[in-house]
Swiss-Prot record:
It is an enzyme of class 2 (transferase). A zinc finger (RING-type) spans 260-297. GO terms for cellular component: cytoplasm. A zinc finger (UBP-type) spans 294-386. This is BRCA1-associated protein homolog 2. Zn(2+) 2 binds at residues 322, 325, 341, 347. Residues 53-63 have a biased composition (Basic and acidic residues). The lineage of its organism: Eukaryota, Metazoa, Ecdysozoa, Nematoda, Chromadorea. Residues 27-80, 99-124, 568-590 are annotated as: Disordered. Zn(2+) 1 binds at residues 310, 313, 330, 337. It is found in: Cytoplasm.
Length: 590
């Protein structure tokens, strides 16, 4: 029940009209509550790492809350089947424990230092019984707060040492925690009906003393020889009340801690609730081999009652059971399977199922009235009557039944001999059957071994084929890898070539347009040049004619055939035929 700072409330429920145990009414609150005291204590315990690690469960992240109750007040409480047991409470004073532990060594010195002259006292006080021990009948309840605020503000000055094994005595516990005795105010030893264990309620002077004690001793072994550990939890207050007051109270701030149905311990942490709303410790439920709830299975599942039926026909009435082998058969007023069993096995006696009558098939009568006398071991006749006394039963025997006893002994011997022969026959048949089964098993084993050899050969060949296939697969994978590399390389080259071709096509279109433009411009320029050449050629012809005419006129002028005045006043005319012939001559020359 180890947990972090979770203060609990211990409540002793006593039987009605029973005296309240006044020593079990104590409130550890010092009167001043701090709203952050519980939170500081929780953080302190977390830093110390005092609590044992909880086992993590697959499929859930956190443990479900324990004992979640409705916030609305409810008075529909039912006591149910309640068993009140004896509860013994022993109170120990902390100061006396310290004094007794410190004065053990000096007891002899104090006794030796007493004055010899002192006489015995005149009056001595005495009391009857043990005033430190109180007994009552009740049930111990453990509660926790529903409201987290109450948990945070609680400053617990009490600790409960729970489930102390009976092998560890109280004096061993006191020596175990002797270092902390000066911090202890009182100790209450509570022995409830829990078998082989008890618990201690330790009250401290201050809240910090309780926390320090919890940090030092929680989950610590009591000694080095045994594996029992000290289990502590904080207690806010302890109460004692009657059952009527308990069930008539309107206190909804507390929730009672349930008890694990497996280990019978109180559940505080590592609690697992299943679909039927029954709660267990996680470690206890893990040890349950079945997949059903143990509580539901115990409460709801009835005991399996074997119904007696005839082994041959299944009839459930008028049944007789063989006293030798236990075979169950129907009577002679049904299918007579019990009599057939006697005919087959020679088992003479059968007992009426559900009755006390024994039938002898050999003598064809009842033999259940012959019993053996307890005084001398003789057989006597027994007649069962409803109101017969034990004395009447013993008075019916006599010496006259000595022969009946001998006859019964011989009959029993013969029946045992028949039984021996019958079972020897069964054993012989069983041996033959086992021999046949053994031979069949040997043949099956040989067949299985042959099949196993064939399967082993096939397996070896398949393994060889598998190795070859694996090798071929590796080679094919290598080739495929190389081919993929080549394909990737060629794809890259093809991509580059396509890009180059695309660029060349673009350049070709550009150059083609430029060539067409050049051709057109060349044609235009050629036409213009031809026109210019024709003009220039005509100008040259005119100049040549001018020069030729000028030379002729100069010659004629020199020869005196023409005068200067005639040249000035003359007009020169050219024929169109001559000009056209000149043009043709020019074209031919070209």
């Amino acid at each position: 029940m180890s947990s972090l700072y979770v203060p609990l409330v211990l409540r002793l429920e006593v039987r009605d009209r029973t005296k309240i145990v006044q020593s079990f009414i104590d409130d550890s609150k010092a009167g001043s509550e701090s709203p952050l005291a519980g939170e500081r204590t929780r953080q302190r315990l977390v830093k110390k790492g005092n609590t044992p690690p909880k086992k993590e469960l697959k499929g859930r992240e956190e443990d479900p809350p324990i004992g979640v109750m409705s916030s609305e007040p409810s008075h529909n409480y039912h006591k149910g089947r309640r068993t009140y047991s004896e509860v013994v409470i022993e109170s120990l004073d902390g100061e006396k424990l310290v004094d007794s532990s410190s004065s053990v060594a000096g007891t002899s010195e104090k006794s030796g230092g007493r004055s010899v002259s002192e006489g015995p006292p005149d009056q001595v006080a005495y009391y009857s019984g043990n005033p430190l021990t109180e007994k009552t009948e009740g049930i111990m309840h453990f509660y926790k707060y529903n409201d987290e605020k109450l948990t945070k503000v609680a400053q617990c000055r009490m600790l409960c040492m729970y489930a102390v094994p009976a092998q560890v005595e109280v004096r061993e516990i006191i020596s175990f925690m002797c270092i902390s005795l000066p911090m202890i105010v009182s100790i209450k030893v509570v022995r409830d009906p829990a078998p082989n264990q008890y618990m201690l309620i330790i009250k401290f002077k201050e809240h910090n003393d309780a926390v320090t004690f919890y940090e030092e001793f929680n989950n610590c072994p009591f000694n080095d020889l045994e594996s029992y550990c000290c289990t502590l939890f904080f207690v806010d207050r302890i109460e004692c009340t009657t059952s009527n007051d308990l069930f008539s109270s309107d206190d909804t701030s507390l929730t009672e801690l349930p008890t694990c149905a497996v280990c019978l311990e109180r559940m505080d942490d590592s609690v697992l609730a299943i679909l039927c709303n029954h709660s267990f410790h996680a470690r206890c439920l893990e040890q349950w081999a079945d997949n059903t709830c143990p509580v539901c299975r115990y409460v709801q599942s009835p005991e399996v009652v074997a119904e007696q039926r005839c082994n041959d026909c299944g009839m459930s009435n008028d049944l007789w059971i063989c006293l030798i082998c236990g075979n169950i058969g129907c009577g002679r007023y049904a299918e007579q399977h019990a009599q057939r069993h006697w005919e087959l096995t020679s088992h003479t006696y059968s007992l009426k199922v559900g009755g006390e009558r024994v039938w002898d098939y050999a003598g064809d009568n009842y033999v259940h009235r012959l019993i053996e006398n307890g005084a001398d071991g003789k057989l006597v006749e027994y007649q069962r009557e409803s109101n017969a006394s034990f004395d009447d039963k013993n008075q019916k025997g006599g010496d006259k039944l000595e022969g009946i006893k001998l006859e019964y002994t011989l009959l029993l011997t013969s029946q045992l001999e028949d039984q021996r022969k019958y079972f020897e026959g069964l054993r012989h048949d069983m041996e033959q059957t086992m021999s046949k089964m053994e031979k069949t098993a040997y043949a099956q084993v040989e067949n299985l071994e042959h099949q196993l050899t064939e399967r082993s050969t096939e397996l070896k060949s398949l393994k060889g084929d598998l190795d070859d296939t694996v090798t071929a697969r590796k080679v094919a994978e290598k080739r495929a890898t190389q081919t993929n590399e080549k394909v990737n390389k060629l794809a890259n080259e093809l991509k580059d070539e396509r890009e180059i071709n695309q660029m060349l096509r673009k350049d070709q279109q550009v150059w083609k347009g430029q060539v067409e433009k050049l051709i057109e411009s060349q044609k235009t320029a050629r036409t213009e040049y031809e026109k210019k050449i024709e003009d220039l050629q005509s100008q040259v012809n005119d100049l040549l004619m001018h020069f030729e005419t000028q030379n002729k006129l100069k010659e004629q002028l020199d020869a005196g055939k023409i005068t200067q005045e005639e040249i000035t006043e003359s007009q020169v005319e050219l024929d169109s035929s001559s000009s056209s012939s000149r043009k043709l001559n020019r074209k031919k020359k070209k």
